[in-house]
A protein has these predicted regions:
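A cross-family glycoside hydrolase active-site/sugar-binding cleft signature
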Residues: 155, 188-189
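P-loop NTPase catalytic phosphate-binding loop
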Residues: 2-107, 112-178
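Short, intrinsically disordered, charge-balanced linker/junction segments flanking boundaries
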Residues: 1, 189-190
């Protein structure tokens, strides 16, 4: 249930993302600081998990990962606003079908056994290139991300980050205590 991200910390040990303990990742950094490399690393790690346990929806408006993702793992890929809006609409339908009904028992909630299928990893490289409203349909299911098997991985430039943290989509992710990675950034960016 974890993906190796790299080496770090005071002892230069392995840094892993346990996606069951910390549902989402937010990575902030300056241009050319390694944000897209992090995305590539996460995609490679999730590919090792297999399509039975993980499916990827990749929003990549710079097309940095085009052709680099195993098609078997890919549930959707978008490089434009229109494609992103369509993918998000389909995701919302899938995730709403996974929401627990009133008949779900506490044990089923704990085991997440009222639905079957892989977890969905929404991977957004360069969130600053995507209009926040493109993700508005997901706002109703984001609070239930753990229950419905949704994980969000976001990279964003550091410039304007403080303001962006108050936009609805990123604010909801922030409220769920994501795994935070801060790469090289100008201190004036906040």
């Amino acid at each position: 249930n974890s993906v190796l991200l790299g080496v770090g910390g005071p002892k230069l040990g392995a840094v892993n993302w346990d996606y069951l303990a910390s549902q989402h990742i937010v990575c902030i950094g300056a241009q050319e600081s390694g944000k897209s490399t992090l995305i590539s690393t996460i995609i490679a790690g999730l590919t090792q998990i297999g399509r039975e346990r993980a499916r990827l929806v990749v929003i990549d408006h710079r097309r940095s990962h085009l052709g680099a993702i195993d098609p078997d793992m890919l549930a959707g890929y978008s490089a434009s606003t229109q494609e992103t809006e369509k993918l998000v609409a389909v995701m919302k339908i899938t995730l709403e079908e996974r929401l627990p009904s009133a008949e779900v028992t506490p044990q089923q909630l704990k085991d997440r056994s009222w639905w079957t299928g892989p977890d969905i990893f929404l991977i957004v490289d360069n969130l600053d290139l995507v209009a926040d409203m493109a993700f508005a349909p997901l706002l109703s299911v984001l609070p239930h991300a753990r229950d419905v098997g949704l994980h969000v991985v976001i990279t964003r430039k550091s410039g304007g980050c403080v303001r962006a943290l108050f936009q609805p989509f990123l604010a909801e992710i922030k409220d769920q205590s994501p795994f935070i990675i801060v790469l090289d950034a100008d201190k004036d960016d906040g």
